[in-house]
Amino acid sequence: MAVPKRKQSRANTHARRSQWKAEVPTLVKTVENGKVTYSLPHRAKVVEDSAGTALFLEYKGRKVADV
């Protein structure tokens, strides 16, 4: 395992950590039953009835799995 030769300064530590940034997820806008919803691309979505009960999973307009 690598062992540092000497202690890293706070400035260098903060400069290194400043490169770690969270990315904003890209969302796809879809219209379901007159409502606009946003979801992650390339993911199966849950199709619900009017009462909110999950019916099945759908991907690209096709039924892919039962819930």
Swiss-Prot record:
Keyword Ribosomal protein: yes
Keywords for the protein's UniProt record, in alphabetical order: Ribonucleoprotein, Ribosomal protein
Domain of life: Bacteria
One GO process term, biological-process aspect: translation
Annotated segments matching region Disordered: 1-20
Basic residues: compositionally biased ranges: 1-19
Record-level GO cellular component terms: large ribosomal subunit
Pfam families: Ribosomal_L32p
A GO molecular-function annotation: structural constituent of ribosome
TM annotation in the entry: none
HAMAP family: Ribosomal_bL32
Family of this protein: Belongs to the bacterial ribosomal protein bL32 family.
Official protein name in the record: Large ribosomal subunit protein bL32
